[in-house]
Design a protein with these regions (language model features):
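N-terminal subdomain of nucleotide-sugar transferases
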Residues: 1-64, 248, 410-413
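Conserved donor-binding/catalytic core segment of Leloir-type glycosyltransferases
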Residues: 4, 220-236, 241-245, 256, ...
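Membrane-proximal helix-turn-helix segments that form the acceptor-binding/catalytic region
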Residues: 93-103, 115-118, 122-126, 152-174
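Carbohydrate-associated surface elements
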Residues: 178, 199
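Nucleotide-sugar-dependent
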Residues: 236, 286-293, 298-322, 329-338
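Nucleotide-activated donor-binding/catalytic signature segment of Leloir-type glycosyltransferases, i.e.
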Residues: 250-252, 258, 265-292
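A short, well-ordered alpha-helix in the C-terminal region of glycosyltransferases
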Residues: 356, 363, 370-384, 396
Length: 413
């Protein structure tokens, strides 16, 4: 099976979409697929092209058997909304043009921004091939959830376009059951929806002793470390976390933030203004280095802003943390909270509730029996959400449906 996969993010970028796409495609190649990735020059989240790459019309490379074609796009930091829209639109157009010359049996496009799916839909019409909408986020609802834009004519148009693309997709693969329920409630045929969640890469992430060199380098020996590794974006509510840290007088607790994003500078400035001593900010690290830094963490902090839309998401940090037996302090409601509580893999606090967060931190630090029970829960969670197993499920689902779709698909778009 020849797969054309269109994605805005791909390694060496190391956010959740890039990681999932790479790991899935890598597994599909082992199952006999020929995969071509259509993406842009790596630049997330700073909007700066990574060393060794250029923002050219076409770039070709091979990454562990995956054919990667990079096309030009308007590049900007993950900050201002209108500039990001230009980024998305330019990549949609460039990927469409490049896709015209790539042979495939099926076309897959992944969100969260769905302009990649416009490219996939257009290619499917012209090339008469089935296409899959991989749904990572309910966009544009998530735009409003972080106050990037208020409801108006633009959001109405985006909502119409979103629903149109769901209906036109041959298959929709959402990452959560909540996404599936949302689609069904909006009239999308349940029979063409298959949930494939994110999962744990058990080959990269596994339980291990704390990395003593990293502890020494950061001068954090003997500290109870609460770690956040990932995007410092508008959705994560890290300003709330920093404000809460300023009210914690336990000097043995230390907070470690690793990553970058639209809010990174703001929360660093906030911590300096408040003269917080028990906090460390580090620049982004490559994916292969994450396990070493995660090893020194006692608690994995996973917050999001308080919003109904975030009740539908499952942060990928859950699966990396569970694979390394790191109990989680989760500030997310909805399906993510259900998973953590069902597996007893962490403690949940109400998003943006300072007193609840502080209380749960103390509980995790001082209740050793609870901590060990949560570690056992992490092991069970990671085993059930094995990334390889989920990648194979997705490939099998696509394979089983593609031949039938080829026979019956008649485009009337």
């Amino acid at each position: 099976m020849k797969v054309l996969f269109i994605t805005d993010n791909f390694p060496p970028e190391f956010n959740a979409p890039a990681t999932r796409t790479f790991e899935h495609c890598n597994e599909w190649i082992k199952l006999g697929a020929k995969v071509t990735i259509l993406t842009c020059a790596p630049n997330f989240p700073q909007g700066k092209v990574y060393k060794g790459y250029k923002n050219k019309i076409f770039q070709f490379e091979k990454l562990q058997g995956i054919r990667v074609i990079r096309v030009w796009s308007y590049i900007t930091a993950n900050e201002k909304f209108l500039k990001r829209i230009l980024d998305y639109l330019s990549f949609s157009l460039s990927s469409f043009i490049a896709g015209l010359f790539i042979k495939s049996d099926i076309i897959i496009a992944t969100s969260p921004q769905f302009f990649t799916t416009i490219s996939a839909f257009s290619l499917s019409v012209l090339k008469r091939k089935p296409w899959i909408f991989e749904l990572r986020d309910l966009w544009p609802d998530s735009i409003m959830a972080v106050n990037a834009m208020k409801y108006g004519i633009v959001i109405k148009c985006l909502n119409y376009l979103e629903l149109f693309l769901y209906k036109k997709a041959t298959m929709v693969i959402p990452l959560t059951m909540a996404f599936k329920e949302n689609l069904i409630n909006r009239g999308i045929d349940e029979n063409k929806i298959k949930v494939i969640t994110n999962g744990s890469n058990l080959e990269l992430f596994s339980p291990r002793l704390k990395n003593l060199k990293i502890l020494d380098d950061l001068k954090l020996n003997g500290k109870f470390i609460i770690g956040y590794i990932g995007t410092h974006g508008m959705a994560h509510g890290l300003d709330f976390i920093v404000n809460t840290i300023s009210k914690i007088d336990d000097t043995d607790m230390h907070f470690l933030f690793i990553g970058d994003g639209a809010k990174k500078r703001e929360i660093e400035d906030l911590a300096k203004k408040m003269k917080i001593k028990n906090i460390t900010f580090l620049d982004p690290i490559c994916k292969d280095d994450v396990p070493g830094y995660l090893s020194i963490v006692d608690i994995s902090l996973i917050p999001l802003k308080k919003s109904d839309i975030f009740k539908t998401v499952i942060p990928s940090k859950i699966f990396e943390s569970s694979a390394m037996k790191k109990p989680m302090l989760l500030g997310v409601e909805g399906q993510a909270k259900d998973i953590i509580e069902d597996y007893n893999a962490g403690i949940c606090f109400e998003p943006e509730n300072e007193s609840d967060l502080i209380e749960k931190l103390k509980l995790l630090k001082y209740n050793k029996n609870l901590y060990e029970d949560l570690q056992d829960g992490c092991t069970r969670l990671a085993a059930d959400y094995n990334r390889i197993k989920l990648a194979r499920q997705m490939y099998q689902y696509i394979s089983n449906n593609i031949s039938n779709e080829k026979k019956r698909i008649t485009y009337t778009n």
